[in-house]
Amino acid sequence: TVDETRIEAVREQMGLNRPIVVQYLDWLNDLIHFDLGNSYVDNRDVFLIVGSALKETACIVLLSAVLQAVGALILGGLLYLTRKNVIGKILAFASIAAISIPAFYLATSFIDVVSVRWNLISVSGNTGLMRYLPAALCLAVGGIAFFGQMLSKAIQQAMSEDSVLYARCRGLSDPYIVVRYAMPQAIISTVPTFMQMMGMCMAGSAIVENIFSLPGLGYRIVNSLTNRDLPVIYATVLFLAFALVIFNILADIIQRLLQTRKGGL
């Protein structure tokens, strides 16, 4: 057993014997001076740990955002154009199912089926974008389905605009009208929600990061909780909260700009 005197000496050295309020105020003061302390585990600077983790999470989320944007545009157009036939019903059902599937199940299934059984994409030893593609893809599936349905409904509303009526009078086909006239209007209405979802993706990436062993912010949080590494926990949660706030602010700004633009038109 560790001597009680030694324990008290360590508590005093780390400032853990002071009142919680004092510890919190000291932490805020250190934060203002960009000093988040050192890790209890390896004594590394917390800013360096969080900085490297933030890079990993940002790569996953940005790649996932690209996949969601491209996939949602394609799915949204197909859902609208095939809404009256069997293919449309199948796509609508598949979209609902995709939204309902948890990310951790997609990630474990991806490793089991795509990587192990089919041996199509390796989940280890990759470099560049391929290192983040499996995690980003699993994170993007639900978003593609969600925004695909949202875009489909927005396209349906946009198809009642006067510009669409004039395009039909000119004899243009429905697929061309959707891509040229309805889709831009639909995108405008979904951009703010898309930005908010990106903030949620940063917070929700912890599951796929741990499954694919990518040392992002979520991965660091789980490991720090296991090791009771308080400085790293505080810093990672702070950065995730800050990212959520930033994405929400960006969503509000974009929404106001788009409303101003539409009002000007």
Per-region residue spans from a language model:
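Hydrophobic alpha-helical transmembrane segments of membrane transport/permease proteins
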Residues: 1-22, 114, 118-134
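Generic structural marker for isolated residues within well-ordered, non-membrane alpha-helices
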Residues: 7, 25, 94, 251
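An internal, D/E-rich "acidic patch" concept
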Residues: 17-73
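Membrane-water interface segments at the C-terminal ends of transmembrane alpha-helices
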Residues: 29, 93-122, 138-142, 149
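Alpha-helical transmembrane segments of integral membrane proteins
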Residues: 50-87, 103, 127-265
